[in-house]
């Protein structure tokens, strides 16, 4: 066993044992240990330094007898004693720290726990700070229960801090008025309430190195990702006032061991570090400290933010604009009070994206399925540059332009022959809105105003705008929250006959029953043909589309195909309707239409639908987006469609190669106990697991593996760019399987 071997073991994703950690602690070559810990930090931990500040919102008169603490009423110290500060004082400190670039601000109070009255005041202080500041809020208020944690979380506090302080085997030597088990229950209550947890302790209170290692493993087993490391500052009047301070080598060794044991955690410099030399602080940052509490601390002197920043930047860490992002930019499907981490992209090229840190990730999502040609494509770049020199935008009402005309000419030969009219829109969701409005206005023109409702199938997804949400699954879909407010639609069961399986004739019976009973009020049936995307990544049998088309024709419904995700080759056919050979009355396309460069969608329909709308009052289709037919987007779309359909590009060959490779390389996932299903269609690969994934954990692990994959629910899937190289795709598939194995 060597230090280097244990380092490589950690870098490969395998934890060291307690015995191995004790062996590391005993090594005389400390520099080798420090450098190994440094490499683990640089490879696995965040290079973006995390700073937190605190306000001691209530001081002194604590009934607990913690031997290290100046706040305890059991000891005579010179610690300040004051009651809870008001919310304006809290806000003043929060805003000051926000201006200094500090990411988090923590409310800290002395005592076992606040009174009910003080809890209300603290919650109001948190709400007050959230109203007037965007700094992320933490709290350390003692031993709280889950109900109290929920109140804090509702007030805007997203992280709870409760130090375990030391090893389980040593805690009773330091405190007898509460137990470490009570602290652990507090942390579990915070997690149950939806908060992150922060927990560490104080080293140098008489514990052995073996007990520090025991402590580090306790935190690892609890999966704590923010670990404050305090150095005991013996305070006159406390039982530990004469405790011999640790020497700098022992402190640095402890930090290195904590990094080996908790390789991805934020190791947070907290109290007592002022006793270290500047050189020792620099070395601690080099070894593994990648977070700090700045400013004045609870019972010891802190440090100035500016001084900390200088040392931190000298150590090679960075402060990113992502703090502004966290505080002010609202990302899709993301909490503003407790946002998932975001990774700042500096450049994208081909099938890769490069982060601010310099790390390059293989792109597995095609930027939510639209960047089929990858990034920075010279053909699309040229089209955008050329068009922007002529005209970036002009209204489409009363005017037209060559890019819109040319795009229409390119699209019509690719879609069903009956599609003869094209309506340009802004996005996929808007395209669905347009399609639904077309269907209603069609029947209005036919004198059947009561035909204004819709039928669809469960587990579908059609977008985030109002009517689009109404035809998404109302129970399991992303928009179930709005169910009571949305128009009530009719939902048939999800088809259970797999694309690659046998057709069950009973699969469409419930759809038939609904249409038979309600056809007089139904304007249309809307479906994602063959592939249900964000609703569950399910691939169903083509015969279902044929049966759906038959029912629509028999009972007088329009048939709408939402091809926004499936269009332009993703399923192995240029459009998914081709799998069944059934033509819709209205068809929505988007996403890959511009190769992922710009937002643009289109709704195509038949002359019959367009004529019925146009020949009856009000004589026009009642829709007109501001950016409809945007020339810049149309020009790029023309370039993308030409590129895709050119013989040299050979999109079918590319998609077939990706499909075959996905089938081969994802097949081993079927043997994993946590995997329910593996399914492949065209350039789509899906692994369905048995439990909902931990999004934050899995996203971070994928980034650490050098791949960009964004799972949701129980689905981990790939929709790579068509231009991805085989070795890049192998990195994606192997990374997927590796991380899914870690879910055990």
UniProtKB/Swiss-Prot annotation:
Its cofactor is [4Fe-4S] cluster; [2Fe-2S] cluster; pyridoxal 5'-phosphate. Residues 44-270 form the Radical SAM core domain. GO terms for cellular component: cytoplasm. The modification N6-(pyridoxal phosphate)lysine is found at residue 591. [2Fe-2S] cluster binds at residues 106, 138, 198, 268. Keywords: 2Fe-2S, 4Fe-4S, Aminotransferase, Biotin biosynthesis, Iron, Iron-sulfur, Metal-binding, Multifunctional enzyme, Pyridoxal phosphate, S-adenosyl-L-methionine, Transferase. One of its GO terms (molecular function) is iron ion binding. One of its GO terms (biological process) is biotin biosynthetic process. Binds 1 [4Fe-4S] cluster. The cluster is coordinated with 3 cysteines and an exchangeable S-adenosyl-L-methionine. (8S)-8-amino-7-oxononanoate binds at residues 368, 461, 591, 624, 710. It catalyses: (4R,5S)-dethiobiotin + (sulfur carrier)-SH + 2 reduced [2Fe-2S]-[ferredoxin] + 2 S-adenosyl-L-methionine = (sulfur carrier)-H + biotin + 2 5'-deoxyadenosine + 2 L-methionine + 2 oxidized [2Fe-2S]-[ferredoxin]; (8S)-8-amino-7-oxononanoate + S-adenosyl-L-methionine = S-adenosyl-4-methylsulfanyl-2-oxobutanoate + (7R,8S)-7,8-diammoniononanoate. [4Fe-4S] cluster binds at residues 62, 66, 69. Pfam families: Aminotran_3, BATS, Radical_SAM. It comes from the Bacteria. Pyridoxal 5'-phosphate binds at residues 428-429, 562, 625-626. SUPFAM superfamilies: PLP-dependent transferases, Radical SAM enzymes. Homodimer. Catalyzes two activities which are involved in the biotine biosynthesis: the conversion of dethiobiotin (DTB) to biotin by the insertion of a sulfur atom into dethiobiotin via a radical-based mechanism, and the transfer of the alpha-amino group from S-adenosyl-L-methionine (SAM) to 7-keto-8-aminopelargonic acid (KAPA) to form 7,8-diaminopelargonic acid (DAPA). In the N-terminal section; belongs to the radical SAM superfamily. Biotin synthase family. In the C-terminal section; belongs to the class-III pyridoxal-phosphate-dependent aminotransferase family. BioA subfamily. This is Biotin biosynthesis bifunctional protein BioAB. It comes from Bacteroides helcogenes (strain ATCC 35417 / DSM 20613 / JCM 6297 / CCUG 15421 / P 36-108). The gene is bioB.
